Amino acid sequence: SRAPRSSSPAITSTSLPTDVVGLTCEPIETVRIGFIGLGARGTEAIRRFTYQKGIQVKALCDLNQFRVDSCQNMLSRANMPEATTYYGSEDVWKQVCERDDIDLIYIATDWIHHAPMMIYAMEHGKHVACEVPAAMTLDEIWKVIDTAERTRKHCMMLENCVYDFFEITTLNMAQQGLFGNITHVKGAYNHCLYDIWPDYNADWRMQYNMAHRGDVYPTHGMGPACQLLDIHRGDRMKYLVAMDSDPVSLPDYLDK
């Protein structure tokens, strides 16, 4: 597998011209968006965007027609132009990425499709915003980074917890110097999903948790912690250690 870049000297915009951490692009007066994945997260994103100025929803894509129709109705109720709809085929999302009248692809599908969709969208000239986690393996992460650097497209993982009130207040306090020189942070995220497990299409999230051990979804705790430590803004991770306790309650839940 590919060696991590952190084994090399620190990456800066001067030592690595292709770095996209500080990427800037020409402003877009009206951002034209294609949405892929219209489950709970995607539908909520559509609702939020009905309140945004300077955007146009150009495409709605999901495996299921009823979800596409529901989001189309949401646009109609907000007096927004009708979007082109895509559904039914597992590969129909590629047609959204291939359009020449879309600036941004917003991805809210199951996890395993995130990286391939991000890469395909950037390769077709689109900026990308993707729900967490952005990728499921280190190889996928590097492919996403390489594609962003090569295509010079924005590629953002939508880690929402860094914008929550507690986290953003804590970050502001840290940046104001209230905690002095920060040398240690802790982050955690506890969320019981028992009530919503059945809502995931084809039970994909439960199936992934059954097949994989460890913290498969660490971004809610890690994102705010990285901001407090100025990761990618003057500091970097050299290594990462993950530990896993026995899954006790989930097998009991499955038995029931």
Language-model regions, residue ranges each:
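Short glycine-enriched loops at secondary-structure junctions
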Residues: 111, 134-135, 188-193
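Predominantly a Rossmann-like dinucleotide-binding segment in NAD(P)-dependent oxidoreductases
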Residues: 37, 150-156, 161-256
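Conserved PLP phosphate-binding loop immediately N-terminal to the Schiff-base lysine helix
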Residues: 134-139, 164-165
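Flexible, glycine- and charge-enriched loops at secondary-structure boundaries
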Residues: 107, 134, 215
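N-terminal glycine-/serine-/threonine-rich beta1-alpha1-beta2 phosphate-ribose binding loop
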Residues: 2-130, 139-154
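Short beta->alpha connector loops at strand-helix junctions that form conserved
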Residues: 131-133, 159
